[in-house]
């Protein structure tokens, strides 16, 4: 009797193969043949689970976003400094988060001129930025930041800083190391907290 096929597991393997391919070769290299080769499968398997390249890209992006959210929640859970934990969790500090960032950046490039993809990207970014803003509000309420700070402005600024530093770390990893990224976050938080 043939082994039971776990469709969710197969889809997940295909999505991870697509993410790795995007990270290694760019989104233009994403083909059924290359994905099939990465999982030692067939192109028929890829087309069975994903009816279009767009569907695969969307699922890959959503999977990377879900992984990032889970890591963010775990980092903040029980942290004595949830804002610092949040900012660090948003950065590409390890192989898994670098993979996610590479997929997000590729997706962002595709979203230019595509209203549906832009909406999805903007929604995810707004959710992350809102979280940073709420954590700043919490710090102000707890007396860890001066009340003169505008949470919306600083939330936007910190989120833009995280995005810029993350991009720099992908294109210039020799300079923008994980240690340097952590240092930059620490410096920014100290500046905010001292007023």
What are these regions, as identified by a protein language model?
Residues 1-9:
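N-terminal intrinsically disordered/low-complexity leader segments
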Residues 13, 17-24, 71-75, 103, ...:
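Solvent-exposed, amphipathic alpha-helical segments
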Residues 13, 17-55, 59:
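Helix-turn-helix
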Residues 56, 87-93, 119-126:
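A ubiquitous short alpha-helical element
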Residues 59, 70-102, 151-158:
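Hydrophobic alpha-helical connector segments
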Residues 62-68:
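Short, basic, alpha-helical segments at the C-terminal edge of helix-turn-helix-like DNA-binding modules
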Residues 95-119:
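Amphipathic alpha-helical segments used for helix-helix packing
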Residues 98, 116-122, 126, 140-192:
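Hydrophobic/aromatic-rich alpha-helical bundle segments in the mid-to-C-terminal region
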């Amino acid at each position: 009797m043939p082994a039971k096929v776990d469709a969710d597991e197969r889809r997940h393997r295909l999505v991870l193969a697509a993410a790795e391919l995007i990270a290694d070769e760019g989104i233009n290299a994403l083909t059924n043949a290359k994905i099939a080769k990465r999982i030692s499968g067939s192109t028929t398997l890829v087309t069975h689970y994903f009816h279009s390249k767009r569907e695969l890209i969307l699922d890959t992006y959503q999977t990377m976003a879900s992984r990032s959210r889970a890591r963010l929640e775990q980092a903040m859970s029980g942290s004595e400094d949830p804002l610092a934990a949040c900012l660090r969790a948003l950065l590409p500090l390890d192989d898994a988060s670098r993979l996610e960032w590479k997929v997000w950046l590729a997706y962002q490039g595709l979203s230019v001129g595509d209203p549906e993809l832009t909406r999805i990207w903007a929604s995810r970014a707004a959710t992350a930025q809102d979280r940073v803003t709420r954590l700043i509000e919490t710090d102000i309420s707890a007396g860890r930041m001066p009340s003169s700070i505008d949470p919306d402005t600083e939330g936007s600024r910190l989120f833009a800083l995280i995005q810029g530093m993350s991009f720099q770390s992908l294109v210039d990893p020799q300079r923008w190391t994980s240690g340097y990224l952590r240092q930059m976050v620490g410096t920014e938080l100290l500046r905010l907290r001292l007023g």
